[in-house]
UniProtKB/Swiss-Prot annotation:
Molecular function terms from GO: ribosomal small subunit binding
Pfam families associated with the record: RBFA
Gene behind this protein: rbfA
Keywords annotated in UniProt: Cytoplasm, Ribosome biogenesis
Family as reported in the entry's similarity comment: Belongs to the RbfA family.
Domain of life per record: Bacteria
Assembly mode: Monomer. Binds 30S ribosomal subunits, but not 50S ribosomal subunits or 70S ribosomes.
Localization terms from the record: Cytoplasm
Composition bias, Basic and acidic residues: 122-132
Primary location recorded for the protein, binned into one broad class: cytoplasm
Biological role: One of several proteins that assist in the late maturation steps of the functional core of the 30S ribosomal subunit. Associates with free 30S ribosomal subunits (but not with 30S subunits that are part of 70S ribosomes or polysomes). Required for efficient processing of 16S rRNA. May interact with the 5'-terminal helix region of 16S rRNA.
UniProt-recorded name of the protein: Ribosome-binding factor A
């Protein structure tokens, strides 16, 4: 009997539901439906949501605009997890309302780190000393004459 292979990434259904949950969370946070002083004083972005294969768990990656005060914002979201779950269930038609988990979005930090690495002296020196493809292509074109 052949074993069922698991795909390497999320299924199309997981991605579609994750996007619906992301939109629902962003709408609730934007409208200010949750009465909390921390959430009221911060604009919170939800750049990504990842769903579990059974669609019962949604991990939302959040970041306050400006990237400051992440811990209080995530704590406030955790406090209001039940209300947020109810709002997501109202907006997204699923058999089960997914349990919500909130994590800090680190993609901006990672992008800044990679940008800093690319601008470092070592990388610049390597780029200057490496032969370019244009230089290698010139002798071939000269031999055709």
């Amino acid at each position: 009997m052949a074993q069922k292979q698991t795909p390497s990434g999320p299924s199309q259904r997981q991605q579609r539901v994750a996007e619906l949950v992301r939109h629902a969370l962003a709408e609730v946070l934007q409208r200010g439906d949750i009465q909390d002083p921390v959430l009221g004083s911060h604009v919170v972005t939800v750049p990504e949501v990842r769903m579990s294969p059974d669609l019962k768990l949604a991990t939302a990656y959040v970041m306050p605009l400006g990237g400051q005060d992440e811990a209080p914002v995530i704590a406030a979201l955790e406090r209001h997890k039940k209300i947020l779950r109810q709002e997501v269930a109202r907006r997204v038609n699923l058999k089960y309302a997914p349990e919500l988990r909130f994590r800090r979005d680190e993609t901006f930090d990672e992008a800044a780190r990679i940008d800093q690495l690319l601008r470092s002296e070592k990388v610049q020196r390597d780029l200057e000393s490496a032969p370019r493809e244009d230089d290698e292509a010139e002798p071939d074109s000269a031999s055709r004459d």
